[in-house]
Amino acid sequence: MPTNWRISSFNGVLLAAYFIPTWTIVAFKIMISPVHAFYERPNIAVALFISDHLHLAAMPTIRAAWLLALGKLTVVAFFAIFLVFITRASIRKTGGGDEALAIALAIGSVISFASMVMASEVGETQALRLHATELLMLLGTAIVLLVEGPAQSQTDRGVTSGDPALEQSQLAYDR
């Protein structure tokens, strides 16, 4: 049975299955209760770094929490757009959803890398492991997406470029 799934598409679907629910839940918890949710396990490194190293007051800390939630929801939105694109076989075969996947991977990698660096600075080993794992998943998919190359467009193989019917005729006055 032939399949028309590209490796990067399949890997992107698996990543979307992880990141959409987890980052959506984390972002909505931040929206509901910014201070309480900011100090939970997925965000503790960012919260401690902001409060300890940047010495921000309560309102700027809440704004930073909302900014983190907005960034995570942006990644979730691009993963959702990728899933919508991947449902159509014609778009999936030509790699039409690769742009949405690439944007989700780029923004998600920046957020995970920054969170990992902040976890390293404040000494949160469990948060460091979580963000390093997320970063490795995102970078692994990005490498697969880059190595796989662009999708081949479907052309009519019956017509070749050497066919005389496709050549433009040259007239005496056209030279």
Give the role of each language-model region.
Residues 2, 78-106:
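Cytoplasmic juxtamembrane regions at transmembrane-helix boundaries
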Residues 5-36:
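N-terminal signal-anchor transmembrane alpha helix
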Residues 106-175:
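Alpha-helical transmembrane segments of multi-pass integral membrane proteins
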Residues 19-29, 75-82, 108-115, 141:
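Helical transmembrane-bundle signal
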Residues 58-75:
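Individual transmembrane alpha-helix segments
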Residues 32-60:
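Membrane-interface interhelical connector segments
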Residues 29-39, 82-95, 118-121, 151-154:
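Juxtamembrane transmembrane-helix termini
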Residues 11, 15-19, 68, 101-111:
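Hydrophobic alpha-helical transmembrane segments of polytopic
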